[in-house]
């Protein structure tokens, strides 16, 4: 978008523009400027203190600059403000730890190989009443696909969907999820960078609408023990010269199979990025549809990677372990880098399954070469430290990310020790609610 065009889009009521980026956790950060400074934000950038942003700079060298991307300009329908995403710079160069910049560079590497990545997410969330404590009240008792009186939140879902096009998101399916007060709104796939932006926007819209109704929306992976967790399955495909290269004559192409092979090979390290919280691993337990075993299959929802039945031009894979606590820019960069590694080195997929993996004996899983995903954030971080490809995907953010997450894990272990709780507890603790509820 030409900046002069974007300036002409201003509604007279728009007086301020929010400059939005995300921190190491994927949490939106930013600042507001008068609308008259938008052109300056695009051309010269607006400086800010990077030491105040989790995972960015230290106080001894904290000056960063945000440059707005005018193509992302939107006006917030319920407020007299506009929003814009952008890229971060340091010393007049792209800042190496900028999450959005990291994904941009990963996509440029894909493009050098002739590929363009498309991703469609399925983010799940809960709606709660909060009464001043961490006793979460459930406002409805609906279940999966309920559309009758048990589903009290249908109007809230519709309102969220009505606002989404104003932010460039196209809603496709709205429904109640399995858990009481759990919901899902799927939106149309797009190019990977746009989809990552869309995830940040979707969480913003959902939380804002929930608040209008006196509720809290949480994307925390497992807010309640004994209830289904919030996932964010990713539907992924690659195109080349406008054609879906995952499309084979029957089923998937060789490129798609190698892409799967790359993800399977790096799955143990990837999970530290796609499921980056202590709480994430309380969702990834047997008994629910969240995957635990490293496997793949056609139509099989017990596998880590499912190939949906829609082949031909709609050919894609569904990566089922990610959750909405992930920083979408980091997660997409890591997954695409792993898949590209599979394509470059022609890694064949392994651990193909047609039956329910959870119902297999341990002996059968071993025979098929099916391994288990890390069972905790600590285990996942150990795997990440050993994986060159996934580490490189995070670029200059890797060091800050791994250090930040190790401190997070150690803080949790200290809490458990203080409360005399076992390290492998699957109970959702107050420590987790305080830390992750508003992610």
From Swiss-Prot:
Cofactor(s) this protein requires: Mg(2+)
MF (Gene Ontology): ATP binding; glutamine synthetase activity; metal ion binding
Keyword hit for Metal-binding: yes
Keywords tagged on the record: ATP-binding, Cytoplasm, Ligase, Magnesium, Metal-binding, Nucleotide-binding
Native species: Pyrococcus woesei
Record's catalysed reaction(s): L-glutamate + NH4(+) + ATP = L-glutamine + ADP + phosphate + H(+)
Name assigned to this protein: Glutamine synthetase
Function (record text): Probably involved in nitrogen metabolism via ammonium assimilation. Catalyzes the ATP-dependent biosynthesis of glutamine from glutamate and ammonia.
Cofactor note: Binds 2 Mg(2+) ions per subunit.
Highest rank taxon of the organism: Archaea
Annotated compartments: Cytoplasm
